[in-house]
Amino acid sequence: LELSLMPHSILQDTRRGQNNADGFGIGFYTDSKLGAAPCLFTSTTPAWNCVNLQRLASKTASRLIFAHVRATTEGSLSEDNCHPFCHGSLMWMHNGGLGGWKQIKRRLGERLADKWYLGVVGGTDSEWAFALFLDTLERMGHDPSSQPENGFGPTVLRKAMLKTIAHINELIDNIPESVVHAENVDTRSLLNFAVSDGHSIICTRYISSSSDEAASLYYSSGTLWETRAPTPGSRDYQMERSDKGADVVLVASEPLTFERGTDAESHRLRRGD
């Protein structure tokens, strides 16, 4: 799977009408001879305006890639705050926000073992959520630093993810009602998380509110992801399916093709998946 850039228009968050111009990051797993940890490249430059990203993307291939364009909600404009975040072989990114963040941040930190608390270097709620995931994984009996040869497995990652979301909800539920009303606290959490150990990926589309819509998430699978036009520089892609296999799986916050009615647009994950 080649790392390739999308045009500016497809990087826009169309549902909320904002440009994700506050930096970006890519993370990808390389040959096992180089170790289990992923390679990271982050920048505070908008993704569509970074010539180094274009140079790297045209010459980089990986079996598993994370890519994230940032629109600041928490934390300053800094490379420390650009997703994805990594520890050992684990890679994490997030689209959304933790409800009541200012009210739960201290208590979330108090739940963490010192090494996970001290391991947070940026100021985003997303990185703190990753620290909570690492702490949860360790409490389940799995060392997040161990980098197992075949990964932790989807069952373990899924269980740790569900527990992490449950912990976040518990912290928010414990905000006193008087504080919620007095400070007009938005307790809704948008938790579109993605985590991988280089072998398995767990993605969530979740909102804590029963009356609001979760942030969008789309997927497409097939045998080949290629440009629709053979012209050099084309960035209009489509998923090819030569058989029933799924050699390529793409998950994204926005539709991945301009063609309406394709799998990338119609296979929308339901809230809570």
Where are these regions (language model features)?
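Conserved short alpha-helical segments that host acidic/polar catalytic motifs at enzyme active sites
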Residues: 1-94, 98-273
